[in-house]
Amino acid sequence: MSSLSSPSTLYDAHGRPLEYLRLAVTDRCNLRCFYCMPEEGIKYMPKHELLSYEEMLRLVEIMTGLGVRKVRLTGGEPFVRRDLVPFMERLADIPGINDLSLTTNGVLTAPHVPTMARIGVKAVNLSLDTLDRQRFFDITRRDELPQVMRTFHALLDAGIQLKINAVVMDGRNIQDLAPLAELTRELPVEVRFI
C-alpha cells in the first residue's frame, strides 16, 4: 500500500500531508469593521448549531490521529465565546498538538495572555489596520484601539510570536502602512498587508 493511501494521514490534492487545522469557534465579533460587517451586525448562527467545545475537542483528537499537529483558533472573534481559555487549556493537552495559535482582534485578549503563554500558545495573528485611534474607530466603528494595543504589548512581553494582519484600503488607511511596517524594525513583529 502506498503512503498516499494510508488511512492514518490526510493529504491535499498535491499529495502533501495535512498537518494544520483552522477551527472557527464562533461567527460572532465585537467589532463592526465596515469591510466585514454592516454596522447593525449580521444574523449569527444559532448557538445550538455551533459545535460544542466537547465536539471540537473530539474532532481535534480525531484529526491528530490523521496527522494534524497545528491548530489555529479563529472566528469571528474567538474571545467572544464564553470559556475559550479553559477550552484552549484542554486543546493544549491533546497529545500530538505541538502548535496552538489563534487569530484575534485583540479587544478582549490581554487579560488572557499570561494563561496563553503558560499553556504554550506559540503565535497570535492580531488584526490591526491602523495605529491611529480615530481611523481605528472609523474602520471598526468601535473605540477599542487602547485595548488592542494592551494586547499587542502583552503578547510581546510574554514572548508569544506576533503577526499583524492589516487590511489595506485606499482612501482609508494608506497613510498607516509605513507606521505599521516600521514596527518590524523596532520589535519582533511580522506585518502582513492583505
What do these predicted regions represent?
Residues 2-99:
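Conserved alpha-helical substructure of the radical SAM core
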